[in-house]
Amino acid sequence: MNPIVPAVERPIEDVQAKADERQIAINKVGIKDIRHPVRVSDRNGGEQHTVANFNMYVDLPHHFKGTHMSRFVEILNQHEHEITVRSFREMLREMNHRLQAESGHIEMVFPYFVTKQAPVSKVQSLMDYQVTFIGEIKGDKPQITVKVVVPVTSLCPCSKQISDYGAHNQRSHVTVAVRIEGFIWLEDIIDLVEEEASCEIYGLLKRPDEKYVTERAYDNPKFVEDMVRDVAARLNQDDRVSAYRVESENFESIHNHSAYAMIEREK
């Protein structure tokens, strides 16, 4: 009987590491819309367990055929621990190092919850806010932008002025994107916006609370232009913010369109 000769394993070819002859570099290549559990620290000293959607890209030099897609997922799996601005910077650096890239980009979108107390009854409920961390790195210099969508109430000053009673009001989305130096709490951004709105909104209100928020908005009317200017004025005074973009969209209750305003500034 002839002895069994073990098969010789052939090396697996690394196709993406081959040279590319077209001599065209790629600005961004990577993975898009991958969901991953994360833990986000909050201002009260706790943390929230949530699920984020990630986009992760790097540049690719003209002489490489492809990037190493699996390494993006490996990096995510290594960062299941608490996500902060600091750890987000570390993730950017690690991604560039692992993929031998000159520049990198990570976006992380997730719901963030804040426990709010109704203004009169003091009943508590959760409010959700859409948060995005955007990281850009070139060389070893990461830049972090934090974006928060804050729903508020807006009431029209013109409608109040010309009407014998009442004024049209609506829910608005104020989107604040700040490029930060150091650290900023998400709640700091949320509080700033809600303080400048006609009135903030709540997950749960009793009748005395409804009366309060209705009258509060009526006493504090604001155009969409007022909203972005008032938020921008606050951001101008915040040394943690090196650049910002403020957008406000009013979902008009008397029209089938929205009112919109935006201010963008490098400080």
UniProtKB/Swiss-Prot annotation:
GO BP field: tetrahydrofolate biosynthetic process
Biological pathway: Cofactor biosynthesis; 7,8-dihydroneopterin triphosphate biosynthesis; 7,8-dihydroneopterin triphosphate from GTP: step 1/1
InterPro entries: GTP_cyclohydrolase_FolE2, GTP_cyclohydrolase_FolE2/MptA
Catalysed reactions, as listed in the record: GTP + H2O = 7,8-dihydroneopterin 3'-triphosphate + formate + H(+)
GO MF terms held by the record: GTP cyclohydrolase I activity
Site annotation May be catalytically important: residues: 156
Source species, domain of life: Bacteria
Statement: the UniProt record of this protein carries the keyword Protease: no
Pfam families for the chain: GCHY-1
EC number: 3.5.4.16
Keywords, sorted A to Z: Hydrolase
Family in the record: Belongs to the GTP cyclohydrolase IV family.
Record NCBIfam families: PRK13674.1-1
Protein name: GTP cyclohydrolase FolE2
Organism: Nitrosococcus oceani (strain ATCC 19707 / BCRC 17464 / JCM 30415 / NCIMB 11848 / C-107)
Gene: folE2
